Amino acid sequence: MTKFQEAVTFKDVAVAFTEEELGLLDSAQRKLYRDVMLENFRNLVSVGHQSFKPDMISQLEREEKLWMKELQTQRGKHSGDRNQNEMATLHKAGLRCFSLGELSCWQIKRHIASKLARSQDSMINIEGKSSQFPKHHDSPCQVGAGESIQASVDDNCLVNHIGDHSSIIENQEFPTGKVPNSWSKIYLNETQNYQRSCKQTQMKNKLCIFAPYVDIFSCISHHHDDNIVHKRDKVHSNSDCGKDTLKVSPLTQRSIHTGQKTYQGNECEEAFNDSSSLELHKQVHLGKKSPACSTHEKDTSYSSGIPVQQSVRTGKKRYWCHECGKGFSQSSNLQTHQRVHTGEKPYTCHECGKSFNQSSHLYAHLPIHTGEKPYRCDSCGKGFSRSTDLNIHCRVHTGEKPYKCEVCGKGFTQRSHLQAHERIHTGEKPYKCGDCGKRFSCSSNLHTHQRVHTEEKPYKCDECGKCFSLSFNLHSHQRVHTGEKPYKCEECGKGFSSASSFQSHQRVHTGEKPFRCNVCGKGFSQSSYFQAHQRVHTGEKPYKCEVCGKRFNWSLNLHNHQRVHTGEKPYKCEECGKGFSQASNLQAHQSVHTGEKPFKCDACQKRFSQASHLQAHQRVHTGEKPYKCDTCGKAFSQRSNLQVHQIIHTGEKPFKCEECGKEFSWSAGLSAHQRVHTGEKPYTCQQCGKGFSQASHFHTHQRVHTGERPYICDVCCKGFSQRSHLIYHQRVHTGGNL
């Protein structure tokens, strides 16, 4: 037995097409061709039989057509004048070209590729011009081991003609009527009983055809249209239907090393190396025959593949999903789709154990481990592991959106985005969470949601170690470290690090408040504000301080509160260096330096430096007192006044003077007291220059100059500048002792 001594290379399994042949393939078939070629190349790389990337693969991955022009240039000058003479000779001999006829070029090419994949098991060698076979012999062409074949003139014409359709023979010129020396002898690994087996079968007027470099023999009758394909490997017989089928498959990694056949049909026990062979075999059970053999009982080897190809060309959908009703033109596409419903993921990554429902998805995943990104964007230099990802990315620069929604006309850069968008109109939510039953219209949303149950946060910041459940959140967070603010407001020029923050900011200019409370009707520009507001009505306070146990209805309030315990004051005033724990406090403080009072009361025209001060002041006019003491029921217009009042009931005095030990119930009282020790008098009268340590004393003194007497006696209507003076005066009417 002659063994194949050299390692299989990509050239051995590559199949190229001419312009004419590619014109017969629709988009689905062209995609299938590309996938098969790329899969063969990756399998060779994985087993170490290919150390470089051929130009053909690079061109296929970039979906370019330059390679077709090159092949046309290489072969065009040899196939012009010769074709007419060869076709005349072939028709005279009663032969037909099956490359573009009943047997499609696609089926022949795939069969050639599958046979080349197994060429490591036997060596094919052709030499010489003389043969022991007559032009017409009386037996099926089952060639035995060690037999020589001489190709006659008609045979040579056919061989040369087949060479025009097959791109396996590249850059070789074969004159009409001649066969290269490398073809003249064929050594096949079969039994030595060839002559006996040929003589025992009574089939007349058969002519042998052989394809270059491949041990495939087809017998075409002068009187019938039967197509019988002979090959070195014996035809596999189906026990249920009795028909013979061919294994037509690309090179796979498993079949090279183990010979394992993992794809088995439901109708019979026949097993195959790949799914495409299984799909072709299943057509036999469906009773599909080649048009060339429609008048006979016997099926041809390729008959199962022809109806599938015809349905793809015509766009007819013959296979339907019982789960969702989606239609497909090929049963293989239906089976792949059904894994969406069953959850089956037969393709597993050996590096990380992740599984996929399609082999193409596994190949796309593998570069994640290698880190290889050979495809670079010419515009921004960004790298990608797949050419398809690069093509999709390029649409960001070109603005191309080729996928349009027929309902609303919205455009998308990716088909998957369009499909997900269409579910908005249909309301379809096919993806269901197994833990809580929640349904989603997009699989990515389901995967993201599942991290809520698993608490998985796979995306980690290299700078601070913070983890995120979404890659998008990580990218947004990283801008905190880089200071990048790619989103600019055209109105005010303000920059933002995230698109969501930018969109929320734009509502400041537009005044849009899309989030409205159903209870009180109040509107909000951001959903987070709206959700926090709703807790005012529900009383929910889900955020708890771990130090003191205090609860808050908003996470931001909790973060601000925690700085009370840590003493952190990240917001510094550039004028005086004073620190603040909250940004709002810093903004309020800065008005002290600028003197700005942008908030104006519409009732009395009084102005304030802070919005909170304006809101507190407006309650003077409305009489609103929303802050009520739970102990005595007394109400106050300001929260700070309520907090001071509550100390009366508790007797608590948490603020202590370190100089004299005196305690105070309010921090302002402690601050005013400390000026007794320091002698500080920050409040100075501009009229007389007198200084005061407390603001209340300063305000009282100013009434001396203004003549204001706001405290009026209810009995005699006499006015006083100080409350204490009024209280002293009232004793005159009550008869109290001085």
Swiss-Prot record:
Keywords: DNA-binding, Metal-binding, Nucleus, Repeat, Transcription, Transcription regulation, Zinc, Zinc-finger. Residues 8-79 form the KRAB domain. SUPFAM superfamilies: beta-beta-alpha zinc fingers, KRAB domain (Kruppel-associated box). The keyword Zinc-finger applies. Pfam families: KRAB, zf-C2H2. A zinc finger (C2H2-type) spans 263-285, 319-341, 347-369, 375-397, 403-425, 431-453, 459-481, 487-509, 515-537, 543-565, 571-593, 599-621, 627-649, 655-677, 683-705, 711-733. InterPro entries: Ikaros_C2H2-ZF, KRAB, KRAB_dom_sf, Znf_C2H2_sf, Znf_C2H2_type. It is found in: Nucleus. One of its GO terms (cellular component) is nucleus. Belongs to the krueppel C2H2-type zinc-finger protein family. May be involved in transcriptional regulation. This is Zinc finger protein 235.
